[in-house]
Amino acid sequence: MTVQQRRRPPIASRETLQALLSEGAQALGVALSDAQRGALLDYVALLAKWNAVYNLTAIRDPRQMLIQHILDSLSIVPHLGAHGAAAAALDVGSGGGLPGVVLAIALPGWRVTLNDIVHKKSAFQNQAKAELKLGNLSVVTGRVETLRPGADVPAKFDVIVSRAFADLADFVTLARHLVAPGGSIWAMKGVRPDEEIGRLPDGARVKQMIRLTVPSLDAERHLIEVELDEAI
């Protein structure tokens, strides 16, 4: 056994991950069925399996994937509830499918579209869609600013969300043409992004800024909702 092997942390069992997921979801106030929990654990397994091929995340440990990716993504679910049980969401710069795949599992009545410019990441997203049997999930490859409602995507979206995609002002500028009436843009951030907020373009303003607490994660997390004049 090599030194590296001796130092490598043991891989958590599915039962351990399931307990961590159940406790975390309960702490977040997100109700999940057995099938939904199973799908989220299957998604973690897919991320771990295909990470070396698709370069999806710097995190290699499934336990940390569950905390830093799944629970982190689940933390926004209660705050998106105002859009109802049947909203349309676009996940911009989705990468390995975060938070969009998690939203599609946790909110089965929603129609979720994943967007990325990297074809191999879109390939993984389609793989996840097929293996997890997510009929409410779709994938579109290309720059968000070039997507046309009614052509590249079916229509405008009630929710446009990103997780560490870009500077907040850039995100709003690139995606605002895709926001449906009554919809808004949601940005998942680490530390409170006051400087980014100060650079928001005309006609865009922060509607709410929510400090998130993610179970088992000792790091700052904020969720910013931006409303637009043209979508009110």
From Swiss-Prot:
EC number: 2.1.1.170
One Pfam assignment: GidB
Superkingdom, natural source: Bacteria
Keywords: Cytoplasm, Methyltransferase, rRNA processing, S-adenosyl-L-methionine, Transferase
Compartments where located: Cytoplasm
Gene Ontology cellular component annotations, sorted alphabetically: cytosol
Catalytic reaction(s) noted: guanosine(527) in 16S rRNA + S-adenosyl-L-methionine = N(7)-methylguanosine(527) in 16S rRNA + S-adenosyl-L-homocysteine
Molecular functions per Gene Ontology: rRNA (guanine-N7-)-methyltransferase activity
Primary site of residence: cytoplasm
UniProt xrefs under CDD domains: AdoMet_MTases
Positions contributing to S-adenosyl-L-methionine binding: G93, L98, V144, E145, R163
Family named by the database record: Belongs to the methyltransferase superfamily. RNA methyltransferase RsmG family.
Function: Specifically methylates the N7 position of guanine in position 527 of 16S rRNA.
HAMAP family from the UniProt entry: 16SrRNA_methyltr_G
Stated name of the protein: Ribosomal RNA small subunit methyltransferase G
Origin species: Burkholderia mallei (strain ATCC 23344)
Gene (name only): rsmG
